[in-house]
């Protein structure tokens, strides 16, 4: 995905989406998908269906029919006999304070424990760094409060994007501040399953943004681990020019 190119599609054709997911699940369950040229050389140990994610180059919680979409996909999961197939929603957390959004997300729980994941972005510990990452004047405290509100009702995975800005990473002080935000969420009764620390892996729209090298990303993640009581996992980036 090239972040320098504007999104092509802005509308969701609900019935088309449901039909396409139904057809894809049938291909996967039957094994027919591995006979197609694109997937024929997939190693046997990788031939599995992990999850269905509500994500993409947009914000799922802005979709008015998100709750219906979650229900429809949950029904398809049951139809195809895939009880272990996870449903995942990725969100920037801006709308998690809205009751209609929370009601939609609560539909994830119907499959029982382990049947879903909700990934919420928390990319900063301080307001100045957050504004630089967001590219606009948003309240970091609002994001933290929204995640805490949601995490009291649903298990949440925190996604923390750690890039460089003009060649400099956020530094250890920012990571300690981020730990404070995470502890604020758990201290308010929020259930955080995991923190995913990652860096850029594709070309960003902002030329000032770059990738943190693997060893340095490990150092920053270790600083976070020292100050939180939830698991922290690291996902390395790649140089998109190569």
Can you describe what each PLM-predicted range is?
Residues 23-30, 75, 149, 180, ...:
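A generic structural signal for well-ordered alpha-helical segments enriched in polar/charged residues
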Residues 18, 22, 102-103, 127-131, ...:
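Generic detector of well-ordered alpha-helical segments enriched in charged/polar residues
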Residues 1-114:
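Conserved Radical SAM active-site core
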Residues 61-210:
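Conserved AdoMet/S-adenosylmethionine-binding subsite of the radical SAM
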Residues 11, 15, 137, 211-218:
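Short, conserved loop/turn and helix-capping segments at secondary-structure boundaries
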Residues 176, 215-242:
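C-terminal accessory extensions appended to soluble enzyme cores
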């Amino acid at each position: 995905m090239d972040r320098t190119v504007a999104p092509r599609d802005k509308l969701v054709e609900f019935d088309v989406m449901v039909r396409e997911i139904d057809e894809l699940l049938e291909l996967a369950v039957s094994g027919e998908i591995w006979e197609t040229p694109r997937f024929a050389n997939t190693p046997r140990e990788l031939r599995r269906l992990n999850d269905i994610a509500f994500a993409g180059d947009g914000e799922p919680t802005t979709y008015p029919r998100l709750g219906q979409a979650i229900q429809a996909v949950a029904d398809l999961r049951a139809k195809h006999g895939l009880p272990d197939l996870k449903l995942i929603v990725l969100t920037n957390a801006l709308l998690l304070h809205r009751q209609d959004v929370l009601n939609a997300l609560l539909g994830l729980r119907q499959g029982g424990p382990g049947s879903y994941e909700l990934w919420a972005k928390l990319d900063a510990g301080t307001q100045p760094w957050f504004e630089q990452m967001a590219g606009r004047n948003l309240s970091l405290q609002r994001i933290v409060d929204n995640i805490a509100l949601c995490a009291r009702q649903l298990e949440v995975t925190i996604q923390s994007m750690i890039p460089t800005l003009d060649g400099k990473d956020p530094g250890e002080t920012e990571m300690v501040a981020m730990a404070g935000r995470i502890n604020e969420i758990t201290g308010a009764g929020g259930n955080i399953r995991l923190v995913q620390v990652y860096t850029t892996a594709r070309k960003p729209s902002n030329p000032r943004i770059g990738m943190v090298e693997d060893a340095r990303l490990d150092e920053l993640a270790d600083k976070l681990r020292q100050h939180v009581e939830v698991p922290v996992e690291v996902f390395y980036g790649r140089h998109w020019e190569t």
